Amino acid sequence: MGKIRVGLIFGGQSSEHEVSLQSARNILQAIDGERFEVSLIGVDKQGRWHASQASNFLLNADDPGRIALRESGENLALVPGECSGQLQTAANAHPLAQIDVAFPIVHGTLGEDGSLQGLLRMANIPFVGAGVLGSAVCMDKDVAKRLLRDAGLKVAPFVSLTRSKAAGADLSAIVEQLGLPLFVKPANQGSSVGVSKVKREADLRAALDEAFRYDHKVLVEQAVIGREIECAVLGNERPRASGCGEIVLSDEFYAYDTKYLNEDGARVAVPADIPDEACQRIRGIAIEAFQALECSGMARVDVFLTPDGEVVINELNTLPGFTNISMYPKLWQAAGMSYRELITALIELALEKGRMDEALSRSCQY
């Protein structure tokens, strides 16, 4: 049996482009070369797909602050239909590699929000991670929190605002409703991009303006006092949860720079130094949230553990980072699963989901 052909898709047009490059580099280094043959598909900031080479697809690869995609002169196109998984040159339709399964690691908008997943679904290519619905729901913090709340899971009180609603909003009433401090964040962004912590009502308008730079909808959320705990979930219909890890901050909050550029801004503690009973509750809640939001493949579930032991869900990330300091792979490594085994498990789950989709009837019989 030949090797399974994996299309590793990375980069993208979002503000998390550079994070995706770091993740792709680590996945490429960890993947089992005896089982998988990798085609690198780099997406530049204009949305063009490039055929990348493993030996030189990154510039400044060892510097998270300057890492960049080396754009090839050969743009790619994806052929759907009977030639499912066929890559070809965009200029002259010259056939290149054909892929059996895609591993999208394009973080943020147009990669993690169901857009790329929809393209792969239409092209009939199995892919790692959540499907169209789960990806879109988890990306939209407003919709995700409403569904979690309806499922009986605890989330922080919040208000969602569009730009037009925010223009005429009574900010004093919002502060009175939610209290201070507040967090203001774009509804459809990850990696803490555009997030502000507001301690004074006078700063709320500026925080809204900053968040609206990145999205048309913004969340104003009550700050939760508690420890930041993360749990990794892996699986399709029978998901399992890892142990718990903790983000121990030295900065004000877990901002973009703290996550990816300043390794001294936070410390990742795996396992988290919390009571076993609390960790078991968090693991159960993580699986409930994973299923409530129609996730599959993988997700990192971020929660707060308050001083009185309450678990408040912050968010679910359906394409968690695979950078050097990312929590998702660290949690599974602590559970005894190596980086390589994790990558293999994710690809196998994608193929399993693809077989289930393929078995569905696509015609009406009377």
UniProtKB/Swiss-Prot annotation:
Comment on bound cofactor: Binds 2 magnesium or manganese ions per subunit.
Query: Which Pfam families does the record match to this protein?
Result: Dala_Dala_lig_C (PF07478), Dala_Dala_lig_N (PF01820)
Main localization category: cytoplasm
Q: Which gene encodes it?
A: ddlA
Q: Where is the ATP-grasp domain?
A: 145-348
Cofactor or coenzyme needed: Mg(2+); Mn(2+)
Name the InterPro entries for this protein.
ATP-grasp, ATP_grasp_subdomain_1, D-Ala_lig_Van_CS, D_ala_D_ala, Dala_Dala_lig_C, Dala_Dala_lig_N, PreATP-grasp_dom_sf
Single GO MF descriptor: D-alanine-D-alanine ligase activity
Please list the coiled coil stretches: none
Subcellular location(s) per record? Cytoplasm
Sites where the protein binds Mg(2+) 2: E315, N317
What GO terms describe the biological role, i.e. biological process, of this protein?
Answer: cell wall organization; peptidoglycan biosynthetic process; regulation of cell shape
Q: Where does ATP bind?
A: 175-230
Report which reactions are catalysed by this protein: 2 D-alanine + ATP = D-alanyl-D-alanine + ADP + phosphate + H(+)
> Where is Mg(2+) 1 annotated to bind?
D302, E315
Pathway linked to the protein: Cell wall biogenesis; peptidoglycan biosynthesis
Q: Does the keyword Magnesium apply?
A: yes
Q: What class of enzyme is it?
A: ligase
Q: Which PANTHER family match?
A: D-ALANINE--D-ALANINE LIGASE (PTHR23132), D-ALANINE--D-ALANINE LIGASE A (PTHR23132:SF25)
This protein's species is: Chromobacterium violaceum (strain ATCC 12472 / DSM 30191 / JCM 1249 / CCUG 213 / NBRC 12614 / NCIMB 9131 / NCTC 9757 / MK)
This protein's GO cellular component annotations are:
cytosol
**Enzyme Commission number(s) from the entry:** 6.3.2.4
Q: Note whether Cytoplasm occurs among the keywords.
A: yes
Q: What is this protein called?
A: D-alanine--D-alanine ligase A
Q: Which family does it belong to?
A: Belongs to the D-alanine--D-alanine ligase family.
Explain the purpose of this protein.
Cell wall formation.
Q: What are the record keywords, sorted?
A: ATP-binding, Cell shape, Cell wall biogenesis/degradation, Cytoplasm, Ligase, Magnesium, Manganese, Metal-binding, Nucleotide-binding, Peptidoglycan synthesis
